[in-house]
C-alpha cells in the first residue's frame, strides 16, 4: 500500500493530472472576470445585469454539467476496472444525455427570457434589466456547445488526460478576451459584446473537443448512437441526484441573489465582484475536487478502497495548503485588488469586507465542504451528498440569509454569513460520512 509502485497514481501522475486542472479552472474563472472587468467600462448597470444572468445560467448549465459528471464517474470506474470498451460505450450515452438536456435548456432560456428575469429580478433598475435581457438571449444560444465541450472534457479527465481540456480552454479564453476587446472597447456594444464573445469561444471549444475525441486512442467513441438503457441508467444514477442537488442549490443562490438585488446596486455589484475575485482563491481546491472524480473513481473501479481513502486525505491536504497560500495575500491586498473594478466608495467598502471574510472562511472549511464531496460521488454515494446539500442550503444559505440579511438588517453581509454557515454544515456531515466508512456503501453499484 505504501510502496509507490503498487499505487494506482504515482506522485508524478497526480501532478500531471492536477496542474492542467488548476490552469483550466483559472482560465474558466478568467473568462468570467474578463466579461465583468471589461464590461465594467460600460457602467455598473451592465456589470449587475451580467451578474444576474450568470446566476440563472449557472443553474441551467449545472443541470447538463451534472450529466457530464455522472458520465465521468462511470467512465473513471470502468477505466480503473480495466474495461476500455465500456469507457467508450459510456461516452456515447452521456453525450446523448448532456446534449439533450443542453438543447432543452437553450429553448427554455430563449422562450422565457423576459419572464424568468421579471420573476426573479422584477425590482431591479430598468438599465440593469435591459442589460440582463440582452446578455441572456445571446448566451443561451451557447448552451449546446458548452454541453458538448463539458462532455468531452469530462471524458478526457476521467481517463486521466486533463491536458486536453486545458489546451482547449486556453484557446477559447484567448478568443473570448480578444472578442471582448473588439466588441466592448471597439464596437462598444456593452452586454451584447460580452455575450457574443462567450458564444464564439464556446462554439470553438465544442468543435475542438470533437476533433480531439476523434483522434484519441484512450477514448473510443462508437458511431452507434442508440440508447443503451443499462449504461444510461448508471449515468443517471449519478447524474440525476447530482443534477437535483446542483439545480436546487442554484435555485437557492438565485433566491439569495434576488434578495441582494433588493438591497440596491451597491450591494448587487459588491456581491458580483466579491464572488468573481474570491473564486480565484478556490481554484486549486475546485481543481482537486474535479480530480477526485478521476482518482477516487478509478480506485473504486479497481476495488482499491484503501487507496481511495489514502488519495482523498492526500489531496485534501494539498487543497488546504493552496487555500492558505492564496488567501493570506488576498486579504493583505484586498483593497488594491478590488480597485481594478472602478467601484464607487460605498461599493468598495462593502466589497473589501466581503472579500476578506470570504478568504478567511475558505481557508477554514471550503475544501471539506466541496472538494471532499466529489470523493463521495466518485464512490457512488450520491444520494447522501444530495440530501445534505439540499437540506443545508435551504436551512442555512436561504433561510438564514433572509433572517440575517433582511430580518436583522445586515444586508448583503448577512447573506454571506449565511452562505458560510452552509459550508460548515456540509463540512461536518461529509467528514463524518467518510470517518465512519459509510461513503463506501455503494462502491460496487456501477461496475459490478
For every predicted segment, state its role.
Residues 16-35, 138, 172, 201-205, ...:
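Transmembrane helical elements of multi-pass membrane transporters/channels
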Residues 30-48, 117-126, 182-189, 247-276, ...:
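Helix-terminus/linker motif at the lipid-water interface of multi-pass membrane proteins
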Residues 9-37, 41-42, 58-70, 99-106, ...:
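N-terminal transmembrane alpha-helices
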Residues 1-21, 75-142, 186-240, 296-362, ...:
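Short alpha-helical transmembrane segments in multi-pass integral membrane proteins
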Amino acid at each position: 500500500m505504501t510502496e509507490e509502485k503498487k499505487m494506482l497514481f504515482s506522485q508524478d501522475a497526480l501532478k500531471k493530472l492536477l496542474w492542467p486542472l488548476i490552469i483550466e479552472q483559472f482560465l474558466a474563472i478568467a473568462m468570467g472576470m474578463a466579461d465583468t472587468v471589461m464590461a465594467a467600462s460600460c457602467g455598473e448597470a451592465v456589470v449587475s445585469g451580467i451578474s444576474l444572468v450568470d446566476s440563472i445560467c449557472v443553474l441551467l448549465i449545472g443541470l447538463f454539467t451534472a450529466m457530464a459528471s455522472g458520465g465521468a464517474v462511470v467512465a473513471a470506474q470502468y477505466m480503473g476496472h480495466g474495461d476500455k470498451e465500456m469507457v467508450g460505450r459510456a461516452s456515447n450515452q452521456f453525450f446523448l444525455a448532456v446534449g439533450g438536456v443542453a438543447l432543452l435548456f437553450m429553448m427554455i432560456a430563449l422562450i422565457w427570457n423576459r419572464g424568468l428575469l421579471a420573476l426573479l429580478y422584477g425590482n431591479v433598475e430598468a438599465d440593469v434589466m435591459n442589460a440582463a435581457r440582452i446578455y441572456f438571449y445571446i448566451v443561451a444560444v451557447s448552451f449546446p456547445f458548452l454541453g458538448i465541450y463539458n462532455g468531452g472534457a469530462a471524458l478526457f479527465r476521467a481517463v486521466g488526460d486533463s491536458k486536453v481540456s486545458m489546451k482547449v480552454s486556453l484557446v477559447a479564453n484567448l478568443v473570448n478576451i480578444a472578442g471582448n476587446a473588439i466588441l466592448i472597447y471597439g464596437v462598444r456594444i456593452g452586454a451584447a459584446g460580452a455575450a457574443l464573445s462567450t458564444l464564439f469561444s464556446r462554439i470553438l471549444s465544442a468543435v475542438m473537443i470533437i476533433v480531439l475525441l476523434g483522434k484519441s486512442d484512450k477514448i473510443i467513441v462508437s458511431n452507434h448512437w442508440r440508447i443503451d438503457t443499462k449504461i444510461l441508467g448508471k449515468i443517471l444514477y449519478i447524474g440525476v441526484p447530482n443534477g437535483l442537488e446542483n439545480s436546487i442549490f442554484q435555485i437557492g443562490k438565485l433566491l439569495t441573489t434576488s434578495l441582494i438585488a433588493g438591497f440596491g446596486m451597491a450591494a448587487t455589484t459588491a456581491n458580483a465582484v466579491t464572488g468573481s475575485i474570491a473564486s480565484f482563491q478556490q481554484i486549486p481546491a475546485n481543481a482537486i475536487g474535479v480530480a477526485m472524480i478521476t482518482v477516487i473513481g478509478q480506485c473504486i473501479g479497481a476495488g482499491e478502497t484503501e487507496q481511495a481513502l489514502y488519495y482523498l486525505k492526500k489531496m485534501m491536504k494539498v487543497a488546504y495548503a493552496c487555500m492558505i497560500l492564496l488567501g493570506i495575500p488576498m486579504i493583505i491586498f484586498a483593497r488594491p485588488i478590488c480597485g481594478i473594478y472602478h467601484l464607487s466608495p460605498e461599493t468598495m467598502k462593502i466589497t473589501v469586507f466581503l472579500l476578506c471574510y470570504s478568504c478567511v472562511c475558505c481557508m477554514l472549511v471550503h475544501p471539506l465542504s466541496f472538494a471532499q464531496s466529489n470523493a463521495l460521488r466518485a464512490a457512488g454515494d450520491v444520494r447522501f451528498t444530495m440530501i445534505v446539500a439540499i437540506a443545508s442550503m435551504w436551512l442555512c444559505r436561504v433561510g438564514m440569509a433572509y433572517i440575517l440579511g433582511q430580518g436583522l438588517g445586515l444586508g448583503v453581509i448577512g447573506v454571506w454569513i449565511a452562505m458560510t454557515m452552509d459550508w460548515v454544515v456540509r463540512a461536518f456531515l461529509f467528514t463524518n460520512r467518510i470517518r465512519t466508512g459509510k461513503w463506501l456503501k455503494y462502491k460496487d453499484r456501477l461496475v459490478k
